[in-house]
Design a protein with these regions (language model features):
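Acidic, Ser/Thr
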Residues: 529-537, 617-625, 756, 848, ...
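Solvent-exposed loop segments of extracellular immunoglobulin-like
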Residues: 536-543, 628-633
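Extracytoplasmic
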Residues: 521-524, 557, 571, 589, ...
Length: 955
């Protein structure tokens, strides 16, 4: 969710114009982008190049913040210019054209990983039938937690994502009883990723729905997930979905919904009804995660953002490096995944690779891909794969600049001279595609040439953050959903905007409404604020507050007491001297106080490595609930990547241990981190609905690329072939610095930097708080003989602060360019202790016969204090007889043995709070085979389940 709209390791806000090498997908986002094009139903002149004058447009804020936005997912504009927008947790909101937001419905949903409420579409006949469509994951009887990676029976995890039609009541509330199930897409639940879920209509009233490949990308090295092993969870094989002509996943579906909610198949889909081994609903196939798309109603063309995988480099044994695409789809077809990407030629075809370690076969034939997966239920030979309209990776498409890769919506503007709207876009922009990018945070117009190719690309004014969805409204204005900067949840930057064309007229003022309290018991006194409200022309504003309980005020910052329980929308309207107005809403809950949630540990900014077992503690409190039921407290792990996040796993409890899986999807130099999201939903009180509160902490990798800084002064980024990930921080001169946040450095005692210098060298100091803050340690950077010649320099750290800080690396030396910094590593305290490792059975971890040969069996045995049962724990290494405890593989049942110490991840064991010992290479637990406690029981690794045969006491 690669390159998702879900939050990651902050590239945003660096203030630099130089590219970030890595990609931004979701999961989520979450998220991923989608779109497809339909059979041409009419003709339209190609768009002519047009320079956009930013001063001619105004970005009007309609809603902002978590209370009004939730976790923003998708939007749809109604005929009255009000906007429906969804949140993943099942909440549906409506924001009026004036900017007043209210919750109009809640749909029960299953919310593991990226699933939940996704897309929304408005029936073309809404004015008379008031129908809308939602795509969501119904709860069903799916087990909680994660599905197993291996096994023989995954039936409990079978689920569906549902396309359903609903009716809005006259007051715009959602009539849940009106639900009609239109179509269900079978899914494999309990594992991430790729839901898709966007909805649109063409001029003929056909409904289009995008679906993701429902496949796990995290164990494929950043290449294609085509793991055909019969004991693997089906989610590791995208051939069963995106490459399957008889499956609705990884597709764009096209149907005609009938009045009774049934549907028919319009002509021109990829497979005619009745074709064996196919589904007639399929319009476009071979898609990984078509998260956002838009249909150009004038031509029937679909413009779709398609997310790709994350491999940093191409591989002769695996396939091409990761890339993403904007696709222009004008007729039914296959777009390649999981066999081909980009140009969909041999050069960008994947290799038929045998998991887990080869061999590699030949490259797939993009002209006639063959799906021979045992999970394929469709045709063996697939339609030829079509090339992407625009493919890009890193800085490969100059007009898109550089940075993370996360293509999103791409609506087409169509000028209507008869439309009386005063804010419609000009005729000069007719036919232009308004492409949006989540991670790079831009909107650009693309001219479409007469032959359908992409023409001139121009910047379009945008002052929000990460674009989640966009569509033109009936007024000819562009409506944009801004995800904000959170990870798997909304935040203060989440917003809904309307971008208006108003080249010479009086522009609308912006209203900002806030309150010192938004929930509590009656009587509830609230102090309201209009701080931040403004007029673009600088005119004096007048203020009008409607508190939602029948009372009003004209004060700029009034105080009001609510005397009765209820849900109230306090609306501020500001008016400028020319009579234009803007509005903002604050939601007030009287009778049910929002809970508080605190993560007591780990601290925000704590260091981790993939494979770690991370113990956590959460404190939740609620005024009305009193004693907290810890089974209602949740902790989720979100894999952060650039400016998005992939929701990976959730478990319940006020305390526990989160197992951070080994990441097998992203480039090792990618900008990754962990987000821990603690959540509690109260029980509701005094007739008022439940309220959910989230709190998040970020964990930082011990080894990090220097170019992933948060802020900097004076430096630049350079491509260097010998650098990790191919990038360094360079042009470093005396007094320059880079900074990172957040960091909690408890237990850190050493710092190592990878550096190069063909300049004069210098010193690098580790500081906290500011560029002139306390120095924890300083290293001397020598002249290495070349900018591509790297060496490691290290220093011990002292006076390390407690708590969460901002980390600064400051640079000093003579004149001119000093050195480059590629990456850095923090070392943590590693107390050494020796003794037996005792299982829950009371027996000891034993080296068979005291043998020292590589491969000697490690087993359970009655404790006897022998040398072959004495283990030395140093950090995460376990040694006996001068050799290391080693996992022979990564699959369930891989033997645990004695082996020459080599520093590999297979010899790295992380102790969990529940007594588990987790192997860093596989993320699996040390296990007494068959749950036996007999002498001689072989020790193996197995998927962690918390059983007694996976509990160990270290010396």
């Amino acid at each position: 969710m690669r390159r998702y709209p879900f939050a990651a390791g902050r590239i945003a806000g660096t203030g630099r114009s130089i590219k970030d090498r890595f990609r931004a997908l979701t999961t989520a986002a979450l998220l991923v982008a989608a779109g497809v094009v339909t059979t041409v139903v009419g003709s339209s002149s190609p768009a002519a190049a047009h320079a956009v004058n930013a001063a001619d447009f105004q970005q009007v804020e309609l809603a902002r913040g978590v209370a009004e936005m939730g976790e923003p997912m998708t939007l749809a504009v109604l005929p009255d210019r009000s906007v429906l927008h969804t949140s993943r947790n099942g909440t549906l909101r409506r924001t009026t054209a004036e900017g007043v937001t209210s919750v109009i419905g809640n749909v029960p949903v299953y919310t593991h990983d990226e699933e939940g409420l996704q897309g929304i579409g408005v029936d073309p006949g809404f004015a008379t039938n008031r129908h809308i469509f939602l795509f969501y994951a119904p709860p069903l009887n799916t087990p909680g937690g994660d599905a197993p990676a291996t096994g023989t029976d995954f039936s409990a995890w079978k689920g569906v994502n549902r396309l359903a039609r609903f009716t809005l009541n006259a007051d715009y509330t959602l009539n849940l009883a009106s639900q009609v199930t239109v179509l269900e897409v079978g899914t494999d639940r309990g594992m991430c990723c790729h839901v898709g879920g966007d909805i649109d209509f063409d001029a003929a009233g056909n409904l289009y729905l995008s679906t993701g490949d429902d496949s796990n990308p995290f164990d494929s090295g950043g290449y294609t997930p085509i793991d055909e092993r019969t004991n693997r969870n089906p989610t590791y094989d995208a051939q069963r979905s995106a490459g399957n002509t008889n499956d609705l996943r990884g597709k764009v579906l096209r149907i005609k919904v009938n009045a009774d909610g049934s549907y028919s198949i319009p002509p021109g889909n990829l497979f005619a009804p009745g074709t064996a081994g196919t589904r007639p609903e399929i319009y476009a196939m071979g898609l990984r995660n078509p998260f956002r798309f838009n249909v150009d109603k004038a031509t029937g063309a679909i413009y779709l953002g398609e997310y790709g995988p994350d491999a940093g480099t191409s591989s002769s044994t695996r396939g091409p490096a990761g890339m993403v695409e904007f696709n222009r789809i004008t007729s039914a077809g296959n777009f390649g995944w999981p066999y081909c990407v980009g140009s969909n030629t041999t050069a960008e075809a994947y290799v038929d690779y045998t998991f887990p370690s080869g061999p590699s076969g030949s490259r797939f034939n993009c002209a006639a891909p063959v799906n021979n997966s045992p999970r394929n239920t469709g045709l063996g030979t697939l339609p030829a794969a079509r090339a992407a309209w625009i493919k890009y990776d890193n800085c490969s498409f100059a007009a898109f600049g550089c940075g993370s890769e996360s293509p999103m919506s791409a609506p087409v503007y169509r000028y209507d001279a008869a439309n009386p709207s005063s804010v419609k876009f000009p005729a000069a922009l007719d036919g232009h595609v308004f492409a949006t990018e989540f991670g790079r945070r831009w909107i650009k117009t693309i001219d479409v040439n007469a032959d359908g190719s992409a023409g001139q690309v121009s910047d379009f004014p945008w002052r929000g953050t990460q674009v989640m969805d966009a569509a033109f409204g009936p007024d000819g204005a562009l409506y944009v959903l801004d995800y904000g900067t959170g990870w798997g949840s909304g935040d203060a930057s989440s917003a809904l905007y309307r971008i208006e064309y108003n080249p010479a007229g009086n522009k609308a003022p912006t209203a900002r409404a806030a309150a010192d309290r938004t929930s509590g018991s009656a009587p509830l006194t609230v102090n309201f604020s209009s701080a931040g409200s403004s007029d673009p022309e600088g005119g004096a504003l007048s203020y009008s507050w409607n508190f939602g309980d029948g009372t009003t005020s004209t004060a700029a910052n009034p105080s009001h007491t609510y005397t009765a329980n209820g849900q109230f929308s306090a609306t501020l309207t500001v008016t400028d001297p020319g009579g234009r107005s803007g509005a903002a809403t604050v939601s007030i809950s009287v009778g049910n106080t929002a809970p508080t949630v605190r993560i007591d540990g780990p601290a925000n900014g704590t260091l981790f490595s993939f494979g770690d077992a991370v113990p956590y503690t959460i404190t939740a409190s609620d005024r009305e609930d009193g004693t907290i039921d810890c089974q209602r407290v949740k902790m989720s792990y979100v894999l952060g990547h650039d400016s998005h996040g992939h929701p990976i796993t959730t478990q319940t409890g006020c305390s526990g241990t989160l197992q951070i899986p080994v990441d097998g999807e992203h480039d090792t130099a990618a900008n990754l981190f962990a987000v821990l999201d603690a959540e509690y939903t109260d029980l509701g009180a005094n007739g008022q609905p439940p309220v959910t509160t989230h709190t998040q902490h970020v964990l930082q990798l011990r080894h990090r690329q220097a170019e992933h800084y948060s802020t900097q002064s004076g430096t630049a980024l350079y491509d260097k072939a010998a650098a990790e990930g191919g990038r360094t921080v360079g042009d470093i001169q005396n007094g320059d610095w880079i900074a990172f946040q957040p960091y909690a450095l408890g237990g850190v005692n050493r710092f190592t930097a990878r550096v190069s210098s063909a300049g004069s060298g210098g010193t690098l100091s580790v500081r906290t708080g500011s560029p002139t803050g306390p120095v924890l340690g300083t290293v001397t950077v020598p002249v290495t003989g070349g900018w591509e010649t790297f060496t490691d320099v290290s220093t011990a750290l002292s006076n390390v602060p407690t708590g969460t800080v901002t980390l600064y690396l400051t640079f000093a030396g003579g004149t001119g360019t000093l050195f480059d910094v590629d990456a850095y590593t923090f070392g943590t305290s590693a107390a050494t202790r020796t003794g037996p490792i005792v299982g829950a059975s009371g027996k000891c971890v034993d080296v068979n016969g005291g043998g020292t040969a590589d491969g000697t069996k490690v087993q359970l045995w009655t404790c006897n204090s022998g040398a072959n049962q004495r283990w030395t724990v140093t950090g995460s290494t376990l040694r006996a007889l001068d050799k290391c405890l080693d996992a022979a593989g990564t699959g369930d049942g891989a033997l645990v043995r004695l082996w020459t110490c080599n520093g590999g991840a297979g010899q790295n064991w992380i102790a969990g709070a529940n007594g588990s010992l987790v192997n860093a290479q596989s993320g699996k637990c040390l296990d007494a085979n068959g749950a036996s406690s007999a002498d001689g029981t072989q020790l193996i690794i197995w998927s962690c389940h918390g059983g007694t045969n996976q509990r160990w006491t270290l010396p």
